[in-house]
Design a protein with these regions (language model features):
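Membrane helical hairpin/interfacial module
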Residues: 16-108
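Structural signal for the C-terminal ends of transmembrane alpha-helices
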Residues: 48-58, 108-115, 139, 175-180
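Hydrophobic, small-residue-rich membrane helices and short re-entrant helix-turn-helix hairpins
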Residues: 29-30, 112-124, 170-192, 254-260
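Membrane-interface interhelical connector segments
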Residues: 204-228
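Short helix-terminus and kink motifs of transmembrane alpha helices
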Residues: 80-87, 115, 244-252
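Long, low-complexity C-terminal extensions of enzymes
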Residues: 262-266
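Membrane-interface loop-to-helix entry segments
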Residues: 62, 96-101, 106-139
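Hydrophobic, membrane-embedded alpha-helices of multi-pass small-molecule transporters
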Residues: 5-24, 38-46, 69-81, 98, ...
Length: 266
């Protein structure tokens, strides 16, 4: 048996998924109604799959497979998040600072215990909520609700692409044993992020055929006209958090693999 220990909290895993979902590239030709209906169906299926995995992962015969798969998947997501954050830094701020900061982030992620990520995650969630409120305030005057009633907005021809993150399936490895079956709802965060972005693009531009940054650039409130830089900085801060968290997740999976190996030897 793997030794029981305190793991990552729900706010930590939720912030990681939310940050990744906001960075997903928008699909063209997806209507708000199609995103809501089809996206909800896919989120429900992913929730069921997550529940099945949470019930089966502790089987001794499969623990090695779960641990290897989780480690490889978290490493892949770590690489992807670094590339996304660096692209934003270079395109929007003409900066390579993230590359210089990366060794420190990886070191911090490896050293900080799972319980140490809860407090910063809760603080960042307040910044995320504040940023969302500021964004809605600046875009409210540009939204045209009639756009939701057009033929393109109500068609259901295409299914949206719902990303699959390692946190959906391997949260039992990260959450410890204190919150059993409590995080199968993580796919709904991705659904809410994608549905909100699609609806916002349709309300402002009439179609969801533009990059997400265009929605931020459309923000205006008399004196300030480039609030997108501040909102992007909030996302970058969350991305830096996710980079450290994914490194900590890899460390946690590695530790559990070592414990599992020792238990098998005994």
């Amino acid at each position: 048996m793997i030794q029981k220990q305190k793991g990552f909290s729900a706010p930590v895993l939720a912030l990681s998924v939310w940050t990744a979902a906001l960075a997903e590239e928008m699909q063209t030709g997806i209507s708000p109604r199609g995103m809501i209906i089809h996206g909800a169906v896919q989120a429900l299926l992913l929730t069921c799959i997550s529940g099945v995995f949470s019930a089966c992962w502790q089987r001794a015969a499969m623990q090695g497979v779960w641990l290897f798969s989780a480690g490889a998947w978290f490493l892949a997501e770590l690489f992807g998040t670094v590339m996304q954050a660096q692209n934003i830094c270079q395109q929007e701020f003409r900066s390579m600072a993230l590359i210089g900061l990366l060794p420190l982030l990886l070191w911090a992620g490896w050293c900080i215990p799972p319980s140490g990520w809860d407090a910063p995650a809760r603080v960042l969630w307040w910044f995320v909520l504040l940023g969302g409120l500021v964004c809605l305030t600046g875009l409210a005057g540009q939204m045209d609700w009639a756009h939701l009633l057009t033929a393109d907005a109500v068609q259901l021809a295409r299914w949206p692409r719902v990303p699959l993150y390692a946190e959906y399936l391997f949260w039992p490895l990260l959450a410890g044993y204190e919150e059993p079956r409590s995080m199968s709802w993580l796919p709904w965060l991705t659904f809410l992020a994608q549905a909100g972005l699609t609806a916002g693009m349709c309300l402002v531009f009439g179609a969801a055929d533009y990059p997400e940054q265009e929605l931020l650039r459309a923000w205006s409130a008399d004196v300030f006209s480039r609030m997108d830089a501040l909102l992007l900085l909030i996302w970058l801060t969350c991305a830096i958090f996710r980079i450290g968290f994914l490194c900590a997740a890899v460390r946690t999976v590695w530790q559990r693999a070592v414990q599992c190996g020792k238990g098998a030897v005994k």
